[in-house]
């Protein structure tokens, strides 16, 4: 959704779609684990884009544990008029680190319990402090002003997303954001990964 250099795994999603499409086109009948192994060689976010849904991801993105669907919610995604280089964001993280350390155990427990507030309370992005995404705090005020449960930077940035309990609030935040930023989207969590649509 977020576009190039937005931190939304756009390149990984494209690669996953190509793998799934080729698997179907050529009748290769590769299993999901085989596709994920191929995808991990292409990019860290490709296995998740293949599997989709709600997962706990570890390693370099190659170790996935399927979880129950995240509680019902809506997202407003705001992409500023600049992007962030993923390699540069990780290099900065390797140099300066981060004081943000999301509580993955608490988040998994909250997902299993279906508790959106607890899911959001345990969420965080360790790359946010060092990504160089200069407008993050300003962008995050918009979803929060419209009742977002939380607002965070996507992946390595630069897009920011707000999590909402209902569509109306997400759309109100999006309408306000469109007055300032060029790309704004409203979305819901997807329950699956890359797939062939016939």
Language-model-derived ranges and their functions:
Residues 1-7, 149-151, 184:
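Short pre-catalytic strand/loop immediately N-terminal to key active-site residues, enriched for Gly-Thr
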Residues 3, 10, 154-158:
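Glycine-rich beta-strand-to-loop/alpha-helix junction loops that act as flexible
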Residues 21-38, 166-179:
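Phosphate-handling active-site elements
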Residues 161-163:
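Short hydrophobic/aromatic beta-strand micro-patches
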Residues 57-150, 165-171, 175-178, 182, ...:
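Conserved, helical-rich catalytic subdomain that frames metal- and/or nucleotide-binding sites
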Residues 8-34, 48-52:
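DPxDG-like acidic metal-binding loop motif
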């Amino acid at each position: 959704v977020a576009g190039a250099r937005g931190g939304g795994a756009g390149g990984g999603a494209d690669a996953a779609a190509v793998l799934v499409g080729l698997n179907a086109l050529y009748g290769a009948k590769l299993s999901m684990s085989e596709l994920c192994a191929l995808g991990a060689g292409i990019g860290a976010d490709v296995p998740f884009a293949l599997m989709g849904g709600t997962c706990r991801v570890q390693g370099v993105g190659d170790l996935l544990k399927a979880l129950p669907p995240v509680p019902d919610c809506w997202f407003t995604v705001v992409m500023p008029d600049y992007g962030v280089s993923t390699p540069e964001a990780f290099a900065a993280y390797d140099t300066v680190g981060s004081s943000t350390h999301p509580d993955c155990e608490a988040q998994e427990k909250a997902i299993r319990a279906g508790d959106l507030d607890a899911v959001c309370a345990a969420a965080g992005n360790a790359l946010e402090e060092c990504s160089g995404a200069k407008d993050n705090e300003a962008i995050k005020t918009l979803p929060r002003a419209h009742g977002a449960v939380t607002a965070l930077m996507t992946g390595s940035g630069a897009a920011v997303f707000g999590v909402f309990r209902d569509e109306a609030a997400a759309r109100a935040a999006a309408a306000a954001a469109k007055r300032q930023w060029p790309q704004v989207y409203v979305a819901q969590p997807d329950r699956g990964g890359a797939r062939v649509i016939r």
